[in-house]
Amino acid sequence: IEQIEEFMPLLINGSYPKIKQDHSKSNIWRKRNKSDGLIDWRMSADSIHNTVRALSKPYIGAEFIHNDVNYKLWETEIIKNNNKNIEPGKVLKIVDSDLPIIKCGINAIKIIESEPKLEVKKGTYI
């Protein structure tokens, strides 16, 4: 709070010191596009989860295609799963009556919210 109390008067009266950006230390990133949110189940569960979080509402959403249907993922949870003998993309189990857990390159992901709702059976590959 002290920092805000010190900063606000300087900002309001225009006396806050301005520092020019050193462009030799800056970088430019292209505009995000649809391909940035494509889910590859060979990715780690951490990477998939972070992609979903980064692109969740109000953004475009992370997505994957299953049976010619485009699914957007809005919420996921990382599930620890060290079984290396299962290929990424396999539905390991269904929990809470309708939430699939899908094997990733490392660990697994529970899909909590998708659009449309993903309805799959255990053992299915996505």
Residue ranges and their predicted role:
Residues I1, E5, K25, A45, ...:
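A general structural signal for well-ordered alpha-helical packing
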Residues I1-I19:
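Conserved anion/nucleotide-ligand pocket segment
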Residues I19-I28:
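Anionic-ligand binding region
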Residues W29-R32, K103-G105:
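Short, flexible turn/loop "capping" segments at secondary-structure junctions
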